[in-house]
């Protein structure tokens, strides 16, 4: 796993998240292209972090004027990918390496393909950002 360095802006968002939710974020990724921040937390804290009816997330979004996405972090690739693609149902995950580039092929239920990809590919982009940061994976393909 590559060493993760956090910027002062990422640390600021993580601190704000903890103040609002009481949950410690493991990591924060700022995605300016989609005007959002992605927070990785321990999966068992997901309910507390989101808050009743999404109250904590909405409060944070209002404060920072960005969309907030929370992902349950897992050490192994398979569980992490399932969390990243949720609520889409993942059938198989295959890693292919060619010319020093790693690609993850994620097969989902046919009716869940749109959910897995997301509007304008934002869910695939989120998966790519996180998998690149933690597992040095270069691209993500949903099939």
From Swiss-Prot:
S-S pairs: none
Keyword list, A-Z: Cytoplasm, RNA-binding, Transcription, Transcription regulation, Transcription termination
Source domain of life: Archaea
Stored Gene3D superfamilies: 3.30.300.20
Gene Ontology molecular function: RNA binding
SMART domains: KH (SM00322)
Family affiliation: Belongs to the NusA family.
Role, per record: Participates in transcription termination.
HAMAP family, per database record: NusA_A (MF_00945_A)
Name of the molecule in the record: Probable transcription termination protein NusA
Organism the protein comes from: Sulfolobus acidocaldarius (strain ATCC 33909 / DSM 639 / JCM 8929 / NBRC 15157 / NCIMB 11770)
Gene that this sequence comes from: nusA
């Amino acid at each position: 796993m590559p060493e993760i360095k956090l910027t002062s802006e990422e640390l600021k968002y993580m601190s704000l998240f903890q103040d609002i939710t009481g949950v410690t974020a493991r990591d924060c990724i700022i995605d300016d292209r989609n005007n959002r921040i992605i927070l990785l937390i321990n999966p068992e804290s997901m309910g507390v972090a989101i808050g009743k009816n999404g109250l904590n997330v909405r409060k944070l979004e209002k404060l920072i004027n960005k969309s907030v996405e929370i992902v349950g972090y897992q050490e192994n690739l398979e569980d992490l990918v399932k969390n990243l693609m949720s609520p889409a149902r993942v059938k198989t995950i295959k890693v292919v390496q060619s010319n020093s580039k790693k690609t993850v092929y994620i097969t989902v239920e046919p009716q869940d393909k749109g959910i897995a990809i997301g509007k304008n590919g934002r869910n695939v982009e989120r998966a790519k950002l996180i998998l690149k940061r933690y597992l040095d994976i270069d691209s993500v393909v949903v099939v």
